[in-house]
Curated annotation (Swiss-Prot):
Phosphorylation of dTMP to form dTDP in both de novo and salvage pathways of dTTP synthesis. HAMAP family: Thymidylate_kinase. The lineage of its organism: Bacteria, Pseudomonadati, Pseudomonadota, Gammaproteobacteria, Pasteurellales. It comes from Haemophilus ducreyi (strain 35000HP / ATCC 700724). Its EC number is 2.7.4.9. The keyword Iron does not apply. Pfam families: Thymidylate_kin (PF02223). The gene is tmk. Belongs to the thymidylate kinase family. It catalyses: dTMP + ATP = dTDP + ADP. GO terms for biological process: dTDP biosynthetic process; dTTP biosynthetic process; dUDP biosynthetic process. InterPro entries: P-loop_NTPase, Thymidylate_kin-like_dom, Thymidylate_kin_CS, Thymidylate_kinase. One of its GO terms (cellular component) is cytosol. GO terms for molecular function: ATP binding; dTMP kinase activity. This is Thymidylate kinase.
Length: 214
């Protein structure tokens, strides 16, 4: 497949804690390189720039006072604005591909579903910060929250977000599914399957995307 004339594309991984995003990231990265795509910028949200990484710390850690859902949401969008304007858009304009660990769908699911913030507020912020900008492909790794959190708890200490109630994560998953089921630019992967099957499903989704991305 010819890939040297392909313009930059933005691929994003989404999913709950313990869904296997880190493993999936490496699977996709390897596949892109094997397809001849060598200029790949890797990002994560929140984070990805000096300021955004500081905001990530504020979002994920406990402080002397509770962090309100609205303050959390605004910090997430501040970090996202920095990353999109200073890293992602310049990379895409230069013909590079971007592989992201989370993007706006995370806020729609976690803050809209989990925190139950007003959808109109979320849509207004999204429009103000991102406008029509969106990933070319989103791969959502779907997993039962109880299974995902059990996996995540075995990987070290849980951060402030990961310590939310199980109901929080079930609401988040429900919103994720609502956002992805009828989204032509999104693919749902059953992350509860054996790793070999998950890997195959991810590779098939990426290959289909590459076929039409020329």
């Amino acid at each position: 497949m010819r890939t040297n004339n392909m313009r930059g594309k933005f691929i994003v991984l989404e999913g709950l804690e313990g869904a296997g995003k880190t493993t999936a990231h490496q699977i996709i990265l390897t596949q892109l390189k094997q397809a001849g795509i060598q200029q790949i910028v890797q990002t994560r949200e929140p984070g990805g720039t000096p300021l955004a990484e500081k905001l990530r710390y504020l979002i994920k850690h406990e402080f002397e006072e509770p962090i309100s859902p609205q303050a959390e949401l605004l910090m997430l969008y501040a970090a996202r604005a920095q990353l999109v304007e200073n890293v992602i858009k310049p990379a895409l304009s230069a013909g590079k591909w971007v592989l992201g660990d989370r993007h706006d769908m995370s806020s729609q699911a976690y803050q809209g579903g989990g925190r139950q913030l007003d959808v109109a507020l979320l849509n207004s912020l999204k429009e103000s910060v991102l406008g029509p900008f969106e990933p070319d492909l989103t791969i959502y790794l779907d997993i039962d929250p109880a299974i995902g959190l059990a996996r995540a708890s075995g990987c070290g200490e849980l951060d402030r977000i990961e310590q939310q109630s199980l109901d929080f994560f079930y609401r988040t998953r429900e919103r994720y599914l609502a956002l992805t089921q009828h989204n032509e630019k999104a693919v749902i992967i059953n992350a509860e399957q054996p790793l070999e099957k998950v890997t195959n499903d991810i590779q098939q989704a990426v290959q289909k995307f590459l076929t039409f991305a020329q």
